[in-house]
Structure formats: structure tokens, C-alpha cells
Amino acid sequence: MGVIELSSRGARCSRRTLLRYGVAGSTLFYAFPPIASRAVHATPPGGTAIARPHTWLLASANQLRPPPPAAPTRGELDELLRMQALRSAVTNAAIAHWNEGAGVLPWTTVALDLVKRTRRNPVRAGRALALLHAAINDAVVAAFDAKEAYFRERPAVVEPAILQQGPITPGLSTFPSEQAAIAGAASTVLIHLFPEETIERINARASDAANTCLQAGANYRSDVAAGLALGRAIGKYAVTRGEADGSNQEWDGKRVHTGEGYWAPTPPRYIPYPLEPMAGSWHTWAVPDVAALRPPPPPAWGTPAWLAELDAVRQATAKRTPEQATAALFWAGNDGTVSPAGIWLEIARDMIKRDRLNTLQTARVLALTSIAMADAFVCCWDAKYTYWSARPIQGDVTLDVLFPTPPFPSYTSGHATISGAAAAVLGGIFPSDAHDLDARAVEAKNSRLWAGFHYPIDNDVGLAHGRQIGRLVLERETTTL
């Protein structure tokens, strides 16, 4: 098989539905070559084979496998019966909420809300979302590894008086609870990433998520305790990686390039310090050599090629349509929004819900997409601070920019690069949507020209660069879900 594929189950996801406006179709720049399969298939008693994704933090799925569980006790069954008797509209709503997107999506929503509230810059937001979803992915993979090793029957099978609520997978072991493992991993990572948020508040969400497994009659308390412990242990691996990924480096303030043709603070804010100048040296997840992927330099300032690029920006901004302005504002992902990476995760979320993906599939889609964008940010910022390219407004201060130009070098476009990476990954997983996803990426990169922030070459090279990065992420993964 040449692509990583998911069944679409019906109509394709309209980009107008997802983005509220469309753009003319475009073609993919490449087809994925065959990718060697490294899937592990788990077959629980009475169940069907499960294609298990790769781990990103653990060396193997069984690295942190918990010890075998004891037999469930009568006391555990009685506890579930008592909780069942107390079910209400409130508990039923909580059960439904924490089961959305197979138990993964609520934590994506929590993270995106934190990105908005704390006003994380796009690069930091992309890094945070990758750490979170890598941890969730590994927690799910490890939980399913343990389920395969230790089969434990559902409480409702052991005690028919228990009426399980929510999704039921016959033949799947309840030990450990994958939902609790997700909660343990996600809460541990989010506490590290967002110290502004109180530990108690995030831990309360983890407890709420885990408790719904009991309220629904889906798991024994020992399943939940084991899942939380497993998830928290994996979350600590993500924290350790985050502490060593180079993101705590401080810039010494020295400029490689200065003078005409190089980035300088731009009107109207004239922010003196460029954003995240060290991000190009952060550790990547799937790209083995950032410098080897670095694009060639842009046209030199003042040359005919550069003048043609600047004229293209003048023309685009002068002829900007209301729809193009709307697109530029949508894709901007400015401070106080979910960020550009968050926009692509919202697209992924809608596709996950449309196709009703299971827990393993959902965790995998979000991890691959987030990791591709995090690596794309690093590679893009490596190019930005290698070339220190001037922004278009430095060549023509009369440009009609839509809002203030971002405070960092122009070449290449971060929006174009991460959009190319995200669309390549999602298009590889959802091949029937690849054309629509590519069109979204093209619109995202064009939006930066329409806003007056980037030359066409910034966007075109960035998009191609991102597609290459997305392909590398897919090549690290398996061929089927």
C-alpha cells in the first residue's frame, strides 16, 4: 500500500464546511512511496486485530507494562452498582463528554483552550501540542499492549445488573483503562507546559475523566488506577523530553546579518526583538537533519528577482478581495486564538469525528499531525534565522498590510510550512480527502501573501518544505490503521 489509509465511511469532508469558504483545487506535489509496515497486531479474546501505532517516547509498547491485575473483587462490583444508582443527567453528560473522540479529543480541546488563554506564540504552541499528543499516543499504545497481555472481562459480563453506558467493545480487556491512561498522560504534560494553570484544576479534569469510567460501569477501580499510573509515567517521559529539547535556550542578541535586505523591526509596532530566534535548533521528532532539509536562499535584495517578488506583494494587497481578507484573518492564528497549528488540529478533529475513529486511530492521527507541525516549525525557523530575510514592508512601507507584520524574518513562511506538513500527513491517512486538504494548505499559504506579510517565494518554498517534512513523519510510521 502506498499511503496510510483510513476508510472514509461516506461523503468527503467539504473544505467549505470545515473552513467556511473554499479555494480553487490544486494538485499534490508528490505521491507517497511504499512505506515498510511496522504495525503490531493485538487480538484480544473474541476481538479483532488491532493495528498498533508507533511509540514516540517509549522504546516499546511494553516498556512500562503494569504487573498482572488481581481478580476483580465483589467490592469493586458493588461500587459500580452504587455509582450506577446515582447516575443523573449531569453524570451522563460527563460520560458523553469524556468519551468524545474515543476519549482523546476532550484533552485536545483542553490544550487548545490553554493555548488561547495563555496566548502562546505559534512556535511554542506547536511544540506543546506535539508533546501532548505524543504522550497521549504512547499512553494509548501502552494501555492496549497491557490489554493484550492481561485479559479482564467487562464488569457488565461478570455482573449482569451493571448496565454499561457509553461505547462498548466486546472482547476487549478492561485492564488498564485507556481513558484513564490518556487522562494521566495529558494532565502530567499540561501541568508542565502551562504552569499558569493551577495543578489542582488540571488534576481535577483528569479525575473527572477517570471517574466517568466508573460511573459508566466500563471499568473496575483497579483498571482506572492502573491506567492513571501508566499515563502519568508516560507523561513524565514527555516532560523529560521537553526539558531537554533545547527550547530553554536564550538568545545572546547577536545578529548574523544586518543592514539593507535583512530583517529589522517593522511598522507600526517596531518590536525590537525577533520571535524565538533559537527555535531552529530545537530537537525534532522525525526529521533527522534540519540543515540537510534547509531550502536555498531567497533572491537577494535589490535584484530583478527580488523586485518581481515585491511587485507581486503590491499587486496582491492592492487587489485583495473581501473573501481573501476573510481567509487571511481565519488562517492568521494570532495571539489569543488556538494558533495556526491548532487550526489544523481542529480540521483533524472534524475528520476524526466524521469517521468515528477509535481510540488508537484518534491518538495516532493527532500525534502524527502535531509532530509534523512541530518539526515543520523547527525547520522553518532554521531557515528564517539562517537568512534573516527582510519582510516586504521593509521594501515598501506603503504596502496595505492587513494587520501588523509578525516580528521575525520573512523567508520561509511558517504558515505555509506547517500547512504543507499537516496536509501531507492528513492526506496520507485520509487519501480521499487529500485534494481538499492540499487546497486548504494552498489557501493557508496564499493568505500570507494576501495579508502582505510574505513574498510568493516564502510561501511556495515553505509549502514544499512542509510537504517534505510531512512525508518524513509518515515514513516513520506504519502503513495501515
Where do the PLM segments sit?
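Intrinsically disordered, low-complexity segments enriched in polar/charged small residues
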Residues: 17-21, 25, 184, 420
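Acidic/polar surface patches and capping/hinge elements
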Residues: 40-481
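Short, intrinsically disordered low-complexity segments
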Residues: 8-15, 19, 37, 204, ...
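C-terminal segment of classical bacterial N-terminal signal peptides
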Residues: 30-36
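N-terminal secretory signal peptides
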Residues: 1-13, 17, 24-30
